[in-house]
């Protein structure tokens, strides 16, 4: 049976992550309060931000920015969108 958590983003019981995505207290908080669905959506959104904004993931400023965006995304706050991104149409 899958481990269930009360997801911070969706405000409901959903399947939890299989393991903490980061070491330490931050990773444990994500493990305890973020669903697998929300985390997968964040990973896709983060990839889109990196690609569309041409972010350098080796830059400390980028890491701080992405951490802030992750917090906003997973907390249901307003978060940045990729400028000029047009989702593919379902034809």
Curated annotation (Swiss-Prot):
It comes from the Bacteria. Gene3D superfamilies: Fe(II) trafficking protein YggX (1.10.3880.10). This is Probable Fe(2+)-trafficking protein. Keywords: Iron. PANTHER family: FE(2+)-TRAFFICKING PROTEIN-RELATED (PTHR36965:SF1). NCBIfam families: PRK05408.1. GO terms for molecular function: iron ion binding. One of its GO terms (cellular component) is cytosol. Coiled coil: none annotated. The keyword Iron applies. It holds the Pfam family Iron_traffic. GO terms for biological process: cellular response to oxidative stress. Could be a mediator in iron transactions between iron acquisition and iron-requiring processes, such as synthesis and/or repair of Fe-S clusters in biosynthetic enzymes. HAMAP family: Fe_traffic_YggX. Belongs to the Fe(2+)-trafficking protein family.
